[in-house]
Amino acid sequence: ASFBZAPPGBSKAGEKIFKTKCAECHTVGRGAGHKQGPNLNGLFGRQSGTTAGYSYSAANKNMAVTWZZKTLYDYLLNPKKYIPGTKMVFPGLKKPZBRADLIAYLKESTA
């Protein structure tokens, strides 16, 4: 199922998902440093593998996907399938509502 068919996202629920599943490796605040994964500030509209100061896998750089709701929705289902060779070890979010909630949170927190 595509993002067009996804339930409306709840950013409060998405914040909880981020804190429990993403914050170990990612930050969202402007000027926050990189952790195991890159800082996600300015995520929407950015091409994969282009955050300054972060060492990406060749797979992320070569994929050249532009991050938006639709691409994140598909990526977050199974990151390793979407970008084979990515360094991201997270297995993904199988529930459509979890992905929609996380995307709603990321849209607010990374703008």
From Swiss-Prot:
Q: Which residues carry this modification: N-acetylalanine?
A: A1
Chief subcellular location equals mitochondrion
GO MF: electron transfer activity; heme binding; metal ion binding
- Keyword Acetylation listed? The answer is yes
Q: So where does heme c get bound?
A: C22, C25, H26, M88
Keyword tags: Acetylation, Electron transport, Heme, Iron, Metal-binding, Methylation, Mitochondrion, Respiratory chain, Transport
| Residues annotated with N6,N6,N6-trimethyllysine modification | K80, K94
State any GO CC term.
mitochondrial intermembrane space
Processing and modification events after translation: Binds 1 heme c group covalently per subunit.
Which family is it part of? Answer: Belongs to the cytochrome c family.
Per the entry, what this protein does is: Electron carrier protein. The oxidized form of the cytochrome c heme group can accept an electron from the heme group of the cytochrome c1 subunit of cytochrome reductase. Cytochrome c then transfers this electron to the cytochrome oxidase complex, the final protein carrier in the mitochondrial electron-transport chain.
Q: What is this protein called?
A: Cytochrome c
